[in-house]
Amino acid sequence: MKAVAFPAKIANLSFPSNCCSLFFRSPATFLSPALPCRKLTKGIRGLEGLMSQCLSSSSQSLSFSSNSFSSQPESELLQALPSSKPKSPPLQLPWLIVGLGNPGKKYQGTRHNVGFEMVDALADAEGISMNTVNFKALFGKGVIGNIPIMLAKPQTFMNLSGESVGQIVSFYKIPLKQVLVVYDDLDLPFGKLRLLPKGGHGGHNGMRSIIDRLKGSRDFPRLRIGIGRPPGKMDTANFVLRQFNRQEQEELDHTFQTGLEAIRILLLEGFNKSATFVNTRKSMEQLS
């Protein structure tokens, strides 16, 4: 039997693999070697009728076939796809808060160790354990608000504080603008606080060591705690190793509470607000 060409409307149809597989060798040509082809000898009408029956019985498979007909427009199919996951927030780098002092019971409660005491007060207030020794420091991690923080008290003795601070900054890749160093200052009146964005060491050996270990950079904030000047002709080295009397300790506790609030403002609201809170506090109290 001769091959018969299909009309264009039939030739352009696409069929699933399970429909009329015996009748077709190509989309546009009808061949008749198989027995079922005898049913189509009555002409194109018979062929169209059989095709209509085939399409009707296969409508369910056609509607779900990804390679043939689709009952949904492309826009609806795209909307049905699962939405992409929301982007994760950028990684929040921690703040490092370092208190300077000397290790050991011999130096507890001395003027040179007020940096240690400030960090201890912060750890107690925020429930942060400082029992781990790491990076040559008593070390702890916690959170204030949604800001991760690290607390450190170098155990290298004051003059080598930079060994510890340098290791922590390098290991965690902490930006220097997020390294706050708390230490004693002879040039400030007792109990007064001063928050600065950067500066030199001012003759403080602990700060000198830190600046050296940070490759000479001075661009990190510091919270200075005033311990006053030595009375009379007392040697400065002896003065900074003296312990506080009871009245001084009570005043210092009040200073620490102010320092805690200043650190919270620094982390949550920024340096400028914290500096305004700290550096204008004394004058505001005097006016009230």
UniProtKB/Swiss-Prot annotation:
Keyword GTP-binding: no
Cellular compartments annotated: Plastid, Chloroplast stroma
EC number(s) on file: 3.1.1.29
Residues at the site labelled Stabilizes the basic form of H active site to accept a proton: 184
The reaction(s) this protein catalyses: an N-acyl-L-alpha-aminoacyl-tRNA + H2O = an N-acyl-L-amino acid + a tRNA + H(+)
Main location: plastid
UniProt-listed InterPro entries: CRS2-like, Pept_tRNA_hydro, Pept_tRNA_hydro_CS, Pept_tRNA_hydro_sf
Any one GO CC term of the record: chloroplast stroma
SUPFAM superfamilies cross-referenced by the UniProt entry: Peptidyl-tRNA hydrolase-like
Binding site for tRNA: 107, 157, 159, 205
PANTHER family, A to Z: PEPTIDYL-TRNA HYDROLASE
Function statement: The natural substrate for this enzyme may be peptidyl-tRNAs which drop off the ribosome during protein synthesis.
Protein's UniProt name: Peptidyl-tRNA hydrolase, chloroplastic
Organism: Arabidopsis thaliana
